[in-house]
Amino acid sequence: RKWGHPDGVAILLNTKYTKKVYFALRVCAQGGKETLSAEKACIWPVAEEREIKMLQLEHLAWQLPGGESILKGVDMHVPKGKLVVVTGPNGGGKTSLAKLVAGLETPTAGRILFDGEDITGLDITQRARKGIAYAFQQPVRFKGLRVKDLLSLAAGKNTSVNEACSYLSEVGLCARDYIDREVNASLSGGELKRIEIAMVLARGTKLSIFDEPEAGIDLWSFQNLIRVFEKMYEQTKGCILIISHQERILNIADTIVVIKNGQVARTGSRADLLPALLGSADAANPACDVLTSKIEGV
């Protein structure tokens, strides 16, 4: 009946090791019991449910003006509504990847597709209008602007100042203490980092990119940050891309991508890949945060 058949009940069959094919079978009621009548059963194909790729990178490459290759043909995707963590050794190309997706750099080869559209040639402002937000690894200090100015700009003209500043509490900052403060040298790196994350929250974008969000913040703030990402993940209709090698961030990922020497070394679900990175004993230990030495061996 769900597919328009007046007499039947739909049953979905999924082949596990071949291409997914679904069939709807008409089940006929006979003698008060539901049985399958071979001569009366109707079999017809039903459309396959497909994973929607919000972000897709195709053969992405980037090199410095001097000719040094940083990224060498990266292929990966971020599904809609998922949280993907990119990890790997220092200097492997993680931050470069984030900058290319955000529009801060232009790839020397390959394509970037966002929500089905080729955005390779768009700059960071144009991509922001498409729904991409980027939180820098090193936060930017905006002279002459107050915290509430930044949050209001991020949230847009249809959002009140009070509503925009409510996002400060989400990242563990008291709005009353910070709302009128100027974004200058009086703010620590950790405070700036949290303000920048609050700006991303205020925007409510389709794709949120965070480059090592744990850098420069204390343990309490980091624990609060994990709760922020978990809440974003539960509420977002888009997706989240995080650059990190902290175990507690990897532990909330749907997918982990390991970038090494400018290429995708491994990719997989958290359940499949995290034990391989940590070793089964370390994977159960939430106090073990630094993965760099493990990742180097991937």
Description of each model-found segment:
Residues 138, 144-163:
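Q-loop/switch helix immediately C-terminal to the Walker
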Residues 209-213, 220:
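Walker B catalytic motif
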